[in-house]
């Protein structure tokens, strides 16, 4: 007897509006249970303090989550000036308090230093791993690990307001950028210290923020399904974006079914309409319905060579 698969073969991306004070993994597990999905993964953790867009990939969509990890992000952040904490946010312990003695001109000049391409040393309170363990585990033991500065890009850093000891900013940045570290570094540059008291992720890649869904909305739909004695999927599956939405910007190669059959077996195939760029990544679809079947690269021979394939569900 074959092993019974747990959960549904449901595939797609849910844009979860993560609530405050739960971990990204806890939020992921709640979504997985509500959808009764056999497989799920998120695309870039948010701190427990943070709220906002957390794309949750279900089923075969998990194969393409790396492209969301690599994408740009946009955040709204409120910092408290005059206090520095060990975690660079309000969940940590205050380690210094200093007077706020600066002008708008000084603030603007300091903010400008964080725009564009810079190098950032990640916080000890991050999920980056050192010798197989997250840095935050070392930090909780009082162990400081040397970290290398990493290149980041801040495409846009917009000043929103400065009132008393609160500074509000909107930041559009590259992958791997730690907003807490930007705020901590800014506080040190200003000479007063700073830490994050509010953080919301507004956008990941080009996903529309009006498609975000809260856990409360999911629970309400789950309750409605139970009351109506219908499968919960009838009410919530329509909330999912297509599994290839993370790579919608890739050039498309459409294969006729007879050629697609070879591609789905892992073979490189020829397409009359392949993009000219060798080694370019493409999104592969099948037939007139343009069903997404995987991603590929165009190899030196001009063939469409599979890189990741969608495994079709078998009843």
Curated annotation (Swiss-Prot):
InterPro entries: PsdUridine_synth_cat_dom_sf (IPR020103), PsdUridine_synth_N (IPR002501), PUA-like_sf (IPR015947), PUA_sf (IPR036974), tRNA_psdUridine_synth_TruB (IPR014780), tRNA_sdUridine_synth_fam1_C (IPR015240), TruB_C (IPR032819). The keyword Cell cycle does not apply. PANTHER family: PSEUDOURIDYLATE SYNTHASE TRUB1, TRNA-PSEUDOURIDINE SYNTHASE. Gene3D superfamilies: Pseudouridine synthase, PUA domain. Keywords: Isomerase, tRNA processing. It comes from Photorhabdus laumondii subsp. laumondii (strain DSM 15139 / CIP 105565 / TT01) (Photorhabdus luminescens subsp. laumondii). The keyword Iron does not apply. Substrate binds at residues 42, 75, 178, 199. Its EC number is 5.4.99.25. The active site is at residue 47. Belongs to the pseudouridine synthase TruB family. Type 1 subfamily. One of its GO terms (biological process) is tRNA pseudouridine synthesis. This is tRNA pseudouridine synthase B. One of its GO terms (molecular function) is tRNA pseudouridine(55) synthase activity. It is an enzyme of class 5 (isomerase). It catalyses: uridine(55) in tRNA = pseudouridine(55) in tRNA. Responsible for synthesis of pseudouridine from uracil-55 in the psi GC loop of transfer RNAs. It comes from the Bacteria. NCBIfam families: TruB.
């Amino acid at each position: 007897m074959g092993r019974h698969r747990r959960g549904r073969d449901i595939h797609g991306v849910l844009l979860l509006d993560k609530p405050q004070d739960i971990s990204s993994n806890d939020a992921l597990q709640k979504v997985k249970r509500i959808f009764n999905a056999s497989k799920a993964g998120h695309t870039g953790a948010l701190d427990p303090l943070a709220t906002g867009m957390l794309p949750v990939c279900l089923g075969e969509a998990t194969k393409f989550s790396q492209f969301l990890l690599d994408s740009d992000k946009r955040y709204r952040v409120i910092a408290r000036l005059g206090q520095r904490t060990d975690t660079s946010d309000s969940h940590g312990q205050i380690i210094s308090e200093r007077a706020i003695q600066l002008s708008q001109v000084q603030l603007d000049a300091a903010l400008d230093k964080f725009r564009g391409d810079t190098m950032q040393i990640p916080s000890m309170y991050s999920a980056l791993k050192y010798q197989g363990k997250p840095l935050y585990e070392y930090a909780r033991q009082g162990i400081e690990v040397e970290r290398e500065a990493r290149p980041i890009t801040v495409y846009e850093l917009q000043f929103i307001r400065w009132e008393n000891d609160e500074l509000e900013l909107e930041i559009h940045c590259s992958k791997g950028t730690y907003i807490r570290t930007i705020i901590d570094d800014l506080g040190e540059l200003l000479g007063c210290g700073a830490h994050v008291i509010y953080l919301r992720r507004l956008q990941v890649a080009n996903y529309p923020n009006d498609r975000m869904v809260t856990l409360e909305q999911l629970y309400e739909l789950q309750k409605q399904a139970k009351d109506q004695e219908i499968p919960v999927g009838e009410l919530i599956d329509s909330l999912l974006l297509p599994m290839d939405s993370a790579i919608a910007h890739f050039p498309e190669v459409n294969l006729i079914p007879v050629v697609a059959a070879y591609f789905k077996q892992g073979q490189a195939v020829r397409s009359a309409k392949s993009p000219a760029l060798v080694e370019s990544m493409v999104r592969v679809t099948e037939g007139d319905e343009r069903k997404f079947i995987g991603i590929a690269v165009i190899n030196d021979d001009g063939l469409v060579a599979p890189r990741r394939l969608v495994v079709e569900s078998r009843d």
